């Protein structure tokens, strides 16, 4: 299921393509590769 606290349990690191980007649980390798700022 979807974690109802997802939006509040993880810090917002930025905004990308109109969607909020949340700090990844794993090292941000994919995020950096995609150029998502944080």
Swiss-Prot record:
<keyword id="KW-0488">Methylation</keyword>
<feature type="region of interest" description="N-terminal extension">
    <location>
        <begin position="1"/>
        <end position="38"/>
    </location>
</feature>
<protein>
    <recommendedName>
        <fullName>Zinc-containing ferredoxin</fullName>
    </recommendedName>
</protein>
<keyword id="KW-0479">Metal-binding</keyword>
<feature type="binding site">
    <location>
        <position position="19"/>
    </location>
    <ligand>
        <name>Zn(2+)</name>
    </ligand>
</feature>
<keyword id="KW-0813">Transport</keyword>
<dbReference type="GO" id="GO:0051539">
    <property type="term" value="F:4 iron, 4 sulfur cluster binding"/>
</dbReference>
<feature type="region of interest" description="Disordered">
    <location>
        <begin position="1"/>
        <end position="38"/>
    </location>
</feature>
<keyword id="KW-0003">3Fe-4S</keyword>
<feature type="compositionally biased region" description="Basic and acidic residues">
    <location>
        <begin position="28"/>
        <end position="38"/>
    </location>
</feature>
<feature type="binding site">
    <location>
        <position position="37"/>
    </location>
    <ligand>
        <name>Zn(2+)</name>
    </ligand>
</feature>
<keyword id="KW-0677">Repeat</keyword>
<feature type="compositionally biased region" description="Polar residues">
    <location>
        <begin position="1"/>
        <end position="11"/>
    </location>
</feature>
<feature type="modified residue" description="N6-methyllysine">
    <location>
        <position position="30"/>
    </location>
</feature>
<keyword id="KW-0249">Electron transport</keyword>
<keyword id="KW-0862">Zinc</keyword>
<keyword id="KW-0004">4Fe-4S</keyword>
<dbReference type="GO" id="GO:0051538">
    <property type="term" value="F:3 iron, 4 sulfur cluster binding"/>
</dbReference>
<comment type="function">
    <text>Ferredoxins are iron-sulfur proteins that transfer electrons in a wide variety of metabolic reactions.</text>
</comment>
<feature type="binding site">
    <location>
        <position position="16"/>
    </location>
    <ligand>
        <name>Zn(2+)</name>
    </ligand>
</feature>
<dbReference type="GO" id="GO:0046872">
    <property type="term" value="F:metal ion binding"/>
</dbReference>
<keyword id="KW-0411">Iron-sulfur</keyword>
<keyword id="KW-0408">Iron</keyword>
């Amino acid at each position: 299921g979807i974690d109802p606290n997802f939006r509040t349990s993880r810090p917002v690191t930025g905004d990308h393509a109109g969607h909020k980007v949340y700090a990844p649980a794993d090292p941000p390798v994919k995020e950096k590769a995609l150029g998502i700022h944080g």
